[in-house]
């Protein structure tokens, strides 16, 4: 019977394991380790929390790629193009519950409550993002930021929230987490449409093909209400390179990339200020600095 159980587990987890072997940046793990500079969580608890966060993050990527109709993930074929959509959905959902099972081993009365709250946030944010895209409704910048805080903040909040359950450090880290959540997502949006590294790794400007309203496109749409070019391009779900190149050129012309870079610089400065106010954190500063290179080097 044992053997069969092992085989079943292997079959169920194969799409998930496929994703794990793709090269990733491990930003969430680095983030948890950096926050531990303040929180000083016992190593055994920290390892479980890092594992849970990585599991949920990677499982959500499997689902994301289906919802976004993506072709590539980190430069490799998406899991569902190899294993099929049904198996991948099941595998990702299975991993969510394995994550929950792991949270139970932390043996803290508030851990499951926190897990549930943050996963609800994650799905609310993701649901809004999909709703706007599929109903061709462009959110305002404020609406978009609120959604991002649910989506990226969901998993950031989970890792740090679980860590705080096992820490004597009780200062409110939410404002800093919010700044970092916005910084990460807007940086991703910028990279998808503007960075060399990204276009080699993801199919060129994939956010345009997906029809996604991202930070630069939202700026372009609201700053030029008389033009419907961007909406029309997003609506087409185009794979045409020339149309996508034209859209990037248009975003450059109307100042959307510059606006996005300035927003990122403001968020970066705000993060340093919030880190300083909590007594400093060299690891976290180094991580933010490293991630900021991308939108600075390009324009020097």
UniProtKB/Swiss-Prot annotation:
List of residues binding isopentenyl diphosphate: 25, 28, 57, 74
Sequence positions that bind Mg(2+) 2: 64, 68
CDD domains assigned: Trans_IPPS_HT (cd00685)
Outcome (variant: residue 261 to H): In MDHLO; shows slightly decreased farnesyltranstransferase activity
PROSITE patterns: POLYPRENYL_SYNTHASE_1 (PS00723), POLYPRENYL_SYNTHASE_2 (PS00444)
Localization per Swiss-Prot or TrEMBL: Cytoplasm; Cytoplasm, Perinuclear region; Cytoplasm, Myofibril, Sarcomere, Z line
Main location: cytoplasm
The keyword DNA damage appears for this protein: no
Pathway(s): Isoprenoid biosynthesis; farnesyl diphosphate biosynthesis; farnesyl diphosphate from geranyl diphosphate and isopentenyl diphosphate: step 1/1; Isoprenoid biosynthesis; geranyl diphosphate biosynthesis; geranyl diphosphate from dimethylallyl diphosphate and isopentenyl diphosphate: step 1/1; Isoprenoid biosynthesis; geranylgeranyl diphosphate biosynthesis; geranylgeranyl diphosphate from farnesyl diphosphate and isopentenyl diphosphate: step 1/1
Record-listed E.C. numbers: 2.5.1.-, 2.5.1.1, 2.5.1.29, 2.5.1.10
Keywords, alphabetical: Acetylation, Congenital muscular dystrophy, Cytoplasm, Deafness, Disease variant, Isoprene biosynthesis, Lipid metabolism, Magnesium, Metal-binding, Transferase
Documented activity regulation: Subject to product inhibition by geranylgeranyl diphosphate.
Listed GO biological process terms: farnesyl diphosphate biosynthetic process; geranyl diphosphate biosynthetic process; geranylgeranyl diphosphate biosynthetic process; isoprenoid biosynthetic process; isoprenoid metabolic process
Organs and tissues of expression: Abundantly expressed in testis. Found in other tissues to a lower extent. Expressed in dermal fibroblast and skeletal muscle.
GO molecular function: (2E,6E)-farnesyl diphosphate synthase activity; dimethylallyltranstransferase activity; geranylgeranyl diphosphate synthase activity; identical protein binding; metal ion binding
Cofactor note: Binds 3 Mg(2+) ions.
InterPro entries reported for this sequence: Isoprenoid_synthase_dom_sf, Polyprenyl_synt, Polyprenyl_synt_CS
Residue sites binding dimethylallyl diphosphate per the record: 73, 151-152, 185, 202, 212
Purpose: Catalyzes the trans-addition of the three molecules of IPP onto DMAPP to form geranylgeranyl pyrophosphate, an important precursor of carotenoids and geranylated proteins.
Disease linkage: Muscular dystrophy, congenital hearing loss, and ovarian insufficiency syndrome: An autosomal recessive disorder characterized by early-onset progressive muscle weakness, sensorineural hearing loss, and primary amenorrhea due to ovarian insufficiency. Some patients become wheelchair-bound by the second decade, whereas others have a milder phenotype and maintain independent ambulation into adulthood. Most patients have respiratory insufficiency.
Family: Belongs to the FPP/GGPP synthase family.
Descriptive protein name: Geranylgeranyl pyrophosphate synthase
Lineage of producing organism: Eukaryota, Metazoa, Chordata, Craniata, Vertebrata
